[in-house]
Structure formats: structure tokens, C-alpha cells
Amino acid sequence: MIAFAYYRLPYLHHATYVAQHEGEPEVLSSVVELNGKEGFVIAPFAPSGECPVVLMHPDESKLISAEGAENASRRGTSYVATQQNLRRDVAKSTSGRNFEAYAREFECFHQQLFEGKFSKIVLARKLRIQSPWLPLDSVQTSKVEDTDKPSDVQNTANTSVVQDADSLKALFLKTCRMYPRLFVALVYTPQSGLWLMATPEILLKGELNQMVTMSLAGTQKAEPSKTVADYPVEGVEWSEKNREEQQYVTDYIEDCIKVFSDDYQKKGPYTTMAANLYHLRTDIAFRLHDTGRLGDVLDALYPTPAVCGIPKDEARRFILQHEEQPRRYYSGFVGPISQEGKTHLYVSLRCMNILDDGSCELYAGGGLLRESEMEKEWKETEAKMQTILSVL
């Protein structure tokens, strides 16, 4: 089974397709091991044996138009039926066990803030739905039995879904059309499975030693009447909680960069818009002393407080122990990496994992401070999930 990725950088009218046909993608236990390496990487929130850092070494690469037509063949009976299932699944997410589980976790996480264990911590959740783009009847008829494949679950996951290449490409192109200002990627490796994302957050990008990262924290629903843009959006009021959250992330990233550079500039914070949400954003550009240490830089930056917490290591351990649903590759990062060429790595937000039966697991989270309110935080995760739900 090949590993492949479609990805489209913000504002571009073309996308890139990369694939590795020969051999297996490189499996790494830590992002530090990316030092001196090139390829296309997908990294989890916390590397482990089950969810390693995976580095593709593409032997095929080509540009494709990101403005293709929608695949109309899915608009049949099964599409209508799964649209009804989608509405049912989303309705279930706002009541019953999903909400109750989130409320329990919120109380657990929130208590740690009052006890002074963390100054900020991020709580995430997951929603599972049946996708109208990959209906079960289509997926099941495309299954290929391969007795030579190992029985390991991670290596066989998504093999049937990936057979439906036309639907997957159409799903990617639709996401590109809906979100021209976001980084859009559809990535499959035997180790990670199949992921689709439309994310606004740069982890690290640049060429040679000129690098850029960002602090993206603070969220509220956007007004439809406002101009959709990445440049500063005027007239948006922010609560003290959101401004404090943004400053935590900015301070953390600035401290990380000082280890690798003594030449950096900040711009912000300012209001930006991503899909249906406003965010507070600060851009940080810096000159990297040693381009062979991209893995070290990534290890210092990620996961940022925007998706983890402060202090980072303690917050990540707490999240791994107390979130009921493992994040897997949500809130990790993805994109092409090069020591001498161009690097474009984005945080894996507004994403979903497409499973072997055609169902999808959507992820979203929000940063908690002492003054956070459970109902507001729940609604924030609902709004963030809407980015990918709108594609479906």
C-alpha cells in the first residue's frame, strides 16, 4: 500500500500530490529525529509505538489544480441517507453521553487550574459520524483482500477506504474550495491512517534559515457580515480571558525561539479569521542559526500551549492520562520538511480521521484558564468542528 498526501498551501490555486511507492515511510520515535531529514511528515500529539512520527520519502510529486469540479456521483440514495445519519450523529453530540463525558473532563481539568498545577491546559474531544462522501456500500464493494498483508491493525487500517481514490480527491478539492485561506491536507500512511484537515495554524515554515511561526490562541465565532481575511480584522472585541490565553502562547514560543535565534521580530497580536471563527494571532519571524536542527526546533515548539498547556511536559502527561479519547494525530503537525529547501509545517487542527468503514472521527479542543466556563468551552469545540462538518 502506497503512502500519499495531497496538500494545498493558503491562497494558492494549485495543490501538490506526493506519494511513496517504493519501500515504507520512515518511522521515527521523536521529532528530534527529523534533524537533517527531508520529506513529508505527519506527527502525532505524543509519539508512541501506536502513533509514531511518520516521514514519507516521496518518489512521485506533481502539481494539480485545486479548483476541480465536485464529484456528483455521490449524490444518490446512499448520499441522502448518510446526510440524514450525519445530522442525527451531530445531534447526538450535543446531548447524552458525549456532553456528559465532556463535562466530567472539564471539571477534572478545571480543578487542576484552581490547584495551581497549570496556568493553561487544553481539553479536546472527539465526534464520530458516518460520512456521506464515503458511504458504506461504496466502501464495502471496494475492499481488497490481501493475504500477504501483515495482520497488524495499524498497517491494515484504511486499506478499503483508500481504494476509492476519486471520492477522496473530490473531498480534498471541495475542502480547498471552501477554505482558500487555510492549509488543506489529505494524508495517508499505513502507520497513521487517513486524515483530512483544514488548519489555520503555522507551526514552522520558511526557506533555508529564514523561518516563521505563529501564536494562534483566543477564539470566538465570527460575524458573517465581516470581511473574510487573514489581515487584521478591525472592530472585534476580545475578553481578558482570550487575551491572557494568547499572551501565554506568545511568551512560550518567544522563549523557545531565543534558544535557536538572536534575531527575531514579532507582529501582533491582531484579529484574524479562519473559516467561521476569529482568532488572536501573533506572527514571529526569525533567523535560524543551524538549519540542520529543524527537529530540535520542532521538539521545543510542539505541542505549543495553543493545543497543550503550560508547563508543556506536565500538561501533555496530564492530557494523555485524563482525556478519555486519545488524540492520535490531532494537534500534532503535518507538511513538507526540508533542511535546505522550503518547509511548510502546520498544526493538525480542524481535522478528521477517516476510518476503514467510511466513518469519520472529528476532533476539536479549547484552551482552559481559571475563568473558563464549561458551556462556552463546549460551544467553542462545536464551532471548531463545524469547519470539517461543513465539508461533509
Predicted regions and their residues:
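Flexible loop/turn segments at secondary-structure boundaries
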Residues: 13-16, 48-50, 129-131, 194, ...
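Contiguous alpha-helical scaffold segments within structured protein domains
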Residues: 62-100, 105-106, 126-142, 214-321
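Secondary-structure boundary elements
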Residues: 103, 111-117, 177-179, 188-192, ...
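Short coil/turn segments at secondary-structure boundaries
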Residues: 119-124, 185-189, 295, 312, ...
